[in-house]
Amino acid sequence: MYEIIFTDKAKKQFLKLEKNNQERIGSVLERIKIRPEHFVERLVGEFGYKLRIGDYRLILDIDKNKLIILVLKVGHRKNIYK
């Protein structure tokens, strides 16, 4: 099972979200711990992955050797890629 780690920036972004969105994202993160490749999409032109949860996106890096999912950014789909 993968371990999920937030960067400091991602943690601040996550905590700024409304409580119901935090709970929804937390629920999905619990499910992806087992097989993240079934839930994420590779980013085009960059290394890393995106996870879609409603109108929100998480930018992730996955280390398959260490079994770590690193959450790099959390935000609304309008702003996350800027």
Each language-model region and where it sits:
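Enriched for short, Lys/Arg-rich terminal
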Residues: 1-12, 16-23, 34, 53, ...
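A short, surface-exposed loop/turn module that caps and links secondary-structure elements
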Residues: 28-52
